[in-house]
Structures are given as structure tokens and as C-alpha cells.
Amino acid sequence: MIHPTAVISEKATIGENVTIGPFCVVDDDVSIGDGCILKSHVVVRGPTRIGKNNKFYP
């Protein structure tokens, strides 16, 4: 689920069953693995690779 207020780059790769909360930003050249959770207001700048089943808080 991607919250409607989240901003996700078209150049980002998002895995399956990923939750991206309100007001998150996922930048270019970011890969988020399956099952990850980004709580509200998380910003991920590239180049970044995130493995499976991680949880991020602001």
C-alpha cells in the first residue's frame, strides 16, 4: 500500500507487499525490498538499496 500523499520517483523500484506511509519521499535510484514498511515522513535518497522486511521510522 502506498499512501496517496507519498512521493515516489518513477525511477525507484518497490518490492511486493511494501507499505509506504503518509508524506514519505522515495528518490531516484532507490530499491526497496519486499515486505518493507516506511512509516510516515520517511525520506529515502538514492543511491540506496534496502533488503527485505525492514521497518523505517521518521
Regions found by a protein language model. Name each.
Residues 1-5:
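Short, basic phosphate-binding NTP loop
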